Amino acid sequence: MKNVLKFIAFATLTFTVAVAQAQGKKKPNIIFILADDLGYGNVHSFNPNSKIPTPNLDKLTEEGIKFTRFYSGNTVCAPSRCALMTGYTMGHAWVRGNAKAKDGLAALRAQDTTLAERLKGNGYKTGMFGKWGLGDEDSKGAPHLKGFDSFYGYLDQSHAHDYYTNRLYEIVGGKTVEVPVDTTKYTEDLIVNKAVDFINANKDQPFFLYLPLTVPHAELKVPAELLKKFQHADGSSKFPPETPFEKKGNYDSQAQPHAAFAAMVNKLDTDVGTIVALIKKLGLDNDTYIFFTSDNGPHKEGGADPVFFNSSGEFRGVKRDLYEGGIRVPLIVRAPGKIAAGQVNPTPWAFWDVLPTLGELSGTATPKNIDGLSFSPLLSGKKAVKDHEYFYWQFNEDGLKEALTKGDWKLIRFKNKGTAEKLELYNLKADIGEKNNIAAKNPDTVKALYALMKQAKTPSENPRFDWSEIEK
């Protein structure tokens, strides 16, 4: 009897210690790196024919999992980031398009709870460094009101075109304020340095680092020493023929746009390497998930040449298109000890799934009413508990565009005010380049997908993105 009591006491103690250890277990750090206008084909591990070396991203791919059918929230900046932060598709999101700076309707509302707010509520230190795009300093969408303890960077996409600006924004004293910047400094360097400081300052506690870098978005401008990597000794470009870009709108002139774009992608790759090296140096490798993706497809502004660089890979379209090239983006996730290296996964998922996925990884509660689903099981080689029936996007510049995918089928709708709609149907398995519109040959499929397209959206509550007039 005495031995039985000893065994029970030992077992009870062991269980108590195990529970205490589980309860006290450190939540994983999460680093989410978001490139700006980087095409699927600009990452060498996603496109072996890429002209630009990306050794750090390739290494990240080797050490983690590569998703080959991951979708952005939209085909331009602000709405894509809205989907990422809130978990809503373009059929339900508050921000469904880009807008000018200081436009209050382009900012998140108080009730639009973000990923950062949820993680902060679960004990995470939260930092963002780069381009926000979802609210100015005096709006309800300012970074300090959307869950970030630290922020340094740009508030709107127009300002973010300037890589040698005289001002950025920072959270100081609990508020987002303008801070002066030395115009001889390349802002990408300043932003990455702040991210490094944030990691060092929070290495002993769970942190969420959101790093929405601004490269390789136009304008095509880099420091001379970075440009030299893609120039011959005589100063000529390693990527001829070059067509000089003359200043237009917000974008400054660039004599060698090919070399400059390559240098910007290389800079992005180097910055990713800096973050990964720091995590290793601090011994945080086994406690940290690193995500890398892009906000939409490649741009063609400011002298950029996505055709020359095969920036969309095998896909049709670029930024502002709802063809695959405008919305299919690279996704790499690395977490040694948690994610087996060298995986390739073709499961489709999207920006609005990031919030619930990170929620499950971190033990953070996820709201029931959002569009996103958790795909965290994919990271450990398992199947998702639930898949989406379909994926939906809408975008309005030069008329309304909508797209919906279901399995291998994809329907795209074009509509301008006063004109009849145009429908295009593609089978992505048979025609990944979306070259052959087979809508006329498949009326039943068109009808079924069209019905889902109506089901996937509600009229926008935001008058800035109310496109009901276009439907007339």
Spans of features found by a protein language model:
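Formylglycine-dependent sulfatase
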Residues: 2-9, 20-424, 428-472
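Repetitive helical segments and hydrophobic/amphipathic motifs
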Residues: 11-15
